[in-house]
Amino acid sequence: MALLVRAALLGAALGPACAAVHFREEFTDGVNWQRRWLNSQYKPDLGKFKLTAGKFYGDPVKDKGLQTCENSKFYAISSRFKPFNNKGKTLVIQYTVKHEQKIDCGGGYIKLFSSNLDQKNMSSDSPYYIMFGPDICGSETKKVHVILNYKNKLYPIKKQIRCKVDGFTHLYTLILRSDQTYKVKIDNEMIESGNLEDDWDFLPPRKINDPTVKKPQDWDDIAQINDPNDVKPEDWDEPEHIPDTSAARSKDWNNATDGEWRHPMIKNPLYRVRAGTIFDNFLITDDEEYAEDFGYETWGETKDPEKVMNIKQTEEEKKRERAEEEKHFRERLNEKVEKKKESGKNKLRRNTVQKEEL
């Protein structure tokens, strides 16, 4: 899944030498967001978005954003803004993303396109200038993408930048400066920086392989081999089927006649694309300080209350689960008591019959 944000990086030069805000979106005006954002119609089965603050939040209005709401779907939505030219200026791209579903596999990244993008037919094949944001899939992929278009060719950053993998809202910021330096920030804290020429393969390498050198005959190309002494841990758990925790016991289920109820088994989805990601607080500007302040005014003010609400909900859920377990325990205990009583009555009847026969 990828949220594709429509951007225009070509056009008229900027005017005043002050902070320029090219795009800002907080989704605080209710349904009016639908006038500014357009779902791609490239495929009929693309997933849809809804406006919500999610299951837990710091503020019911400020934390509203676009949420993916269909599992195992691809998503594409875009918003248009006035073209601009960032030549000689800093470019700051910033937004918040929350994987409240504790995602197994899916992207939370955005893309910036040219002004000639066909929004209705936008797809993964649509050319773009910049791709930025987190991408998660299983235990192997938990990284922040920074892909830049240079001379119509896409170049990913060579460094590995780890993204946040919890279920809370996080602020992602990309800063590209005119002096060829960059910064990547998460939650307004710098996690990576450097020089564009060093960390992307835009230019030919300064050194190349010597074509006259030949590989020795006894050269071993295998960098790693399987450890023959390694064995799978005894507690390794990767069953083919797992309980369906979303299933509920029917009201007419009777443990005495139907047996103890258990969750039905389903195939184990090791890495499945789950919906629930929320995108919010988009900002494109040329001012680093403005972006940092905007981040604190939005994400910064609601991040702590969001965690408090989540903790409260978790505690309440645990109480409900304990109450349900106690209820089932009492039901099973009562059933056993009733069975013993019935068994005692049957034994008494047999003894009475035997005495009468004597």
Predicted features, each with a name:
Residues 11-43, 296:
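Extracellular carbohydrate-recognition regions
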Residues 59-62, 67-154:
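Secretory/extracellular carbohydrate-interaction modules
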Residues 147-173:
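Short, aromatic/His-centered strand-loop micro-motif at the edge of beta-sheets
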Residues 168-183, 187:
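Localized edge beta-strand/strand-to-loop motifs within extracellular or lumenal beta-rich domains
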Residues 189-270:
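Short, solvent-exposed beta-strand-to-loop segments that form ligand-recognition rims
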